């Protein structure tokens, strides 16, 4: 099941959060339709901006839209003209006051949506699909927070008459593990032979207790204080028998005790047999 379903929806409420956050009673269908229209508006006019994610949050009379982009300068525009245009279009679409937040993506190579968009752009420019997939995998695996990646292309690959699907994978991508932090992205490439779908799964470690494993992982002995052996208080153990020095005949003699006559017999027998 984890191989087929969208990884983000599969983990909702467990390790992932909703991309649209609002509450509605009778306006539920209307709000869903508006959310779809907002995402289409932002994706259609800002292909070059590298939008990784769009989050929508609603109140009674306001709509907040957070745009996560790799190139915030394109979204903002010169002196904020592009951002003002986007805000005006969103207010015209929703009929409410819109708060627009533009957030920069720090590592575009580790974002599945941006990786899929990059591969799709190369396919549109007639780059060989295997070369584009391998290049994307190599650049993603250089990131410290990426543990595994899978890239899949589906369609008339290489202009073949029959469509097929091919994928490359490196590292671990546990799609069935619910605590795994899986980033998923989908993008379609428009070529002369038709559409080619590009899907990307990126594994970034396990989320345990609300924290990512990579961030929470620390050396085992870093927090635990190191125990020091007290000098001169503990008797030394002999390596062969595992007893203290006072437990042997030599120890008893050194301590002023007389060795039992029957205790020396097994020792001598052992030495003669050896």
UniProtKB/Swiss-Prot annotation:
Q: Which UniProt keywords apply?
A: Ribonucleoprotein, Ribosomal protein, RNA-binding, rRNA-binding
Q: Where is this region: Disordered?
A: 215-274
Example GO molecular function term?
A: mRNA binding
Give one GO biological process term: translation
Organism domain of life: Bacteria
One Pfam family from the record: Ribosomal_S3_C
Compositional bias segments (type: Low complexity):
238-266
SUPFAM superfamilies the record matches? Prokaryotic type KH domain (KH-domain type II), Ribosomal protein S3 C-terminal domain
User: Gene3D superfamilies per the record?
Assistant: 3.30.300.20, Ribosomal protein S3, C-terminal domain
Cellular component (GO) terms are: cytosolic small ribosomal subunit; peptidoglycan-based cell wall; plasma membrane
Q: Where is the KH type-2 domain?
A: 38-106
What does the UniProt record say this protein does?
Binds the lower part of the 30S subunit head. Binds mRNA in the 70S ribosome, positioning it for translation.
Q: How does it assemble?
A: Part of the 30S ribosomal subunit. Forms a tight complex with proteins S10 and S14.
Which family does the similarity line name?
Answer: Belongs to the universal ribosomal protein uS3 family.
**Entries under HAMAP family matching the protein:** Ribosomal_uS3_B
User: What name is this protein filed under?
Assistant: Small ribosomal subunit protein uS3
């Amino acid at each position: 099941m984890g191989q087929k379903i969208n990884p983000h929806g599969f983990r909702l409420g467990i390790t992932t959060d909703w991309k649209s956050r609002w509450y509605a009673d009778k306006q539920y269908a209307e709000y869903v339709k508006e959310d779809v229209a907002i995402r289409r508006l932002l994706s259609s006019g800002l292909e070059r901006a590298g939008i990784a994610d769009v989050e929508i949050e609603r109140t009674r009379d306001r709509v907040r839209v957070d745009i996560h982009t790799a190139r915030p300068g394109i979204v903002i525009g010169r002196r904020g003209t592009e951002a003002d245009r986007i805000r005006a279009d969103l207010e015209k679409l929703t009929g409410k006051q819109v708060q627009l937040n533009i957030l920069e993506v720090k590592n575009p190579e580790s974002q599945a949506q941006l990786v899929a968009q990059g591969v799709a752009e190369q396919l549109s420019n007639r780059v060989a699909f295997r070369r584009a997939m391998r290049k994307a995998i190599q650049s993603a695996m250089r990131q410290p927070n990426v543990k595994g990646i899978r890239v899949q292309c589906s369609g008339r690959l290489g202009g073949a008459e029959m469509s097929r699907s091919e994928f490359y994978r490196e590292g671990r991508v546990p799609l069935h593990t619910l605590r795994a932090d899986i980033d998923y992205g989908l993008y379609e490439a428009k070529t002369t032979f038709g559409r080619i779908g590009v899907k990307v799964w990126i594994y970034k470690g396990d989320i345990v207790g609300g924290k990512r494993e990579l961030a929470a992982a620390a050396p085992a002995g870093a927090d635990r204080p190191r125990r020091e052996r007290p000098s001169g208080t503990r008797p030394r153990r002999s390596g062969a028998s595992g007893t203290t020095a006072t437990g042997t005949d030599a120890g008893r003699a050194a301590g002023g005790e007389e060795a039992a006559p029957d205790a020396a017999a097994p020792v001598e027998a052992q030495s003669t047999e050896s």
